Amino acid sequence: MTATRTGALAWLTPWRALILPFVHPEEADAISAYFTAHRFIVDHQDARLAIAACGGASTCERGTTDTRADALALMLFARRVRKTGVALHVSGCAKGCARQAATPFTLIAHAGRYDLIVDRTARDAVTNNAKRLDLAAARETLETMARNAGRRRELERQ
């Protein structure tokens, strides 16, 4: 759309980013509005930037859960926990393809339920069926952990 309407060059990066290097300033607002309306990330404060999620069941034979939808349900939590960078990795399996680095919180899917690990990678996880949480329980556990961490930081400042 943009390249056709504006005659601009458009590049798609391996990181799923679209670069429009030669947009005329007078067209920037209209282009931004178009991409916003189509649910692209156009603001560096967008809460979706605080999460990493694999394609899940709809895109991977190993995935058993709709990880992207679950990640979107948790994105505001992730942004509250960490103002910049990735705070939450939602992985469809123990491979952890969406993020290889350690993340403050990682949820690893197992048929609609999640293992929760802290400050490690999905590949570091030791599975334990007794700890598997549904999305609501995972959200509640994450919120509790974040509140407790905030209290600890407050006590350390005193």
Predicted regions and their residues:
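Small-residue-enriched alpha-helical segments and adjacent helix-cap loops
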Residues: 1-111, 115
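Mobile "lid/hinge" segments at catalytic clefts and subdomain interfaces of large enzymes
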Residues: 101, 106-158
